[in-house]
């Protein structure tokens, strides 16, 4: 009897082709469309269009489609932490948390309730199982590789997951969809954070976090202007500072270099590679190891953003924290970002950046930049929710 595989059908071309390939491999395939966010009146969230597209794919492939809402779980496990991190001066990545908590957390459990032996998605990554060991490997299409977003998914969950697109390039995926007559073959890829869509990020965040004005200063303490809240700015930011044209300074862009949480001050500098923007060392906590290091030091690569290249580095490892020394400085690294570690194509795991030392700071500065785990803020509006739905 063929194995039942539950495919997360998002409404996009990637998940549609994942389902197609599994059908061609002889599996019993069921589609599962999950909703994590409510459609808003302005139409920024594409939930309704995504569901309609998932319906059309399921009909074309002749597979059942189930629908479920994880809005409550997303609200509590992802979005509330996202807001708390920004309120605490961090720069989080909710997509990493969503993969750990929702897509390969509660959704994987739901797939098992549907009788699925595995959960498959349209992620560009590879899972290799050999010798009793599971390895998470980069996709063949390096430009589309999504291992960075999967770094926090536990090995036990990944062992029950299939990534059918791991050996394919994006162009090949679209061509497969076109030849199979899938109605989403030319549907544009989704971009940005899922619950924000194409709306201005500042306006979205301002709907939940109240302004908290403070000074914009140079590293020497000269006041240049006012910001409306540290939460609305991130390290390396250039736009929206409104501090240009200052007498005594060159006509050059200003960049956010640091946040002084104690004084609610935003520190800005001139120069794209100003020393205060270049991280020479940083600390990572909230670790998830997919391949546990054998010793207390490790030479590997580190990736701190999606689609950024690996930077060779040395790790000094203890039970709860990793100190990272990159072989070359990393620009605009913010507390709250995720760092993923790689040995060649294999993702070893990763964690959250909790402290940063730059080329212009003394060694003890890394302690000063370390932030406590964020507390959830008081919200200006309630968080979205949606009731669960069943099979369609």
Task: Locate predicted features.
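ATP-dependent adenylation/nucleotidyltransferase module used to activate substrates
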Residues: 1-152, 162, 171-172, 178, ...
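AMP-forming adenylation/ATP pyrophosphatase catalytic core
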Residues: 13, 120-127, 132-385, 391-392
């Amino acid at each position: 009897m063929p194995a039942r595989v539950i495919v997360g059908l998002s409404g996009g071309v990637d998940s549609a082709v994942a389902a197609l390939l599994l059908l061609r491999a002889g599996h019993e395939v069921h589609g599962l469309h999950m909703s994590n966010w409510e459609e808003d009146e302005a139409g920024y969230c594409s939930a309704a269009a995504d569901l309609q597209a998932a319906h059309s794919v399921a009909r074309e492939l002749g597979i059942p489609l189930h629908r479920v809402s994880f809005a409550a779980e997303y609200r509590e496990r992802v979005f509330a932490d996202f807001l708390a991190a920004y309120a605490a001066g961090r720069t989080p990545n909710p997509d990493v948390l969503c993969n750990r908590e929702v897509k390969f957390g509660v959704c994987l459990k739901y797939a098992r309730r549907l009788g699925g032996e595995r959960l498959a998605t349209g992620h560009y990554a590879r899972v290799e199982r050999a010798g009793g060991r599971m390895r998470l490997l980069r996709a063949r299409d390096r430009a589309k590789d999504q291992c960075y977003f999967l770094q926090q998914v536990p090995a036990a969950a990944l062992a029950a997951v299939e990534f059918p697109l791991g050996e394919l390039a994006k162009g090949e995926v679209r061509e497969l969809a076109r030849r199979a007559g899938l109605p989403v073959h030319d549907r544009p890829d989704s971009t940005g954070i899922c619950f924000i869509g194409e709306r201005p990020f500042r306006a979205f965040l301002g709907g939940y976090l109240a302004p908290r004005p403070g000074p914009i200063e140079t590293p020497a303490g000269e006041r240049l202007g006012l910001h409306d809240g540290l939460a609305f700015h991130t390290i390396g930011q250039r736009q929206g500072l409104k501090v240009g044209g200052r007498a005594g300074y060159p006509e050059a862009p200003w960049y956010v270099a640091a946040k002084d949480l104690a004084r609610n001050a935003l520190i800005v500098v001139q120069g794209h590679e100003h020393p205060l923007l270049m991280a020479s060392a940083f600390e990572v906590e909230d670790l998830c190891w997919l391949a546990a290091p054998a010793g207390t030091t490790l030479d590997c690569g580190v990736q701190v953003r999606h689609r950024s290249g690996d930077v060779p580095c040395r790790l000094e490892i203890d039970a709860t924290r990793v100190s990272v020394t990159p072989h070359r400085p990393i620009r605009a690294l913010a507390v709250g970002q995720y760092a993923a570690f790689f040995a060649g194509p294999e993702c070893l795991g990763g964690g959250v950046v909790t402290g940063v030392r730059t080329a212009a700071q003394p060694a003890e500065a890394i302690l000063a930049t370390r932030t406590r785990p964020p507390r959830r803020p008081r919200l200006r509006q309630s968080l979205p929710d949606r009731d669960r739905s069943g099979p369609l």
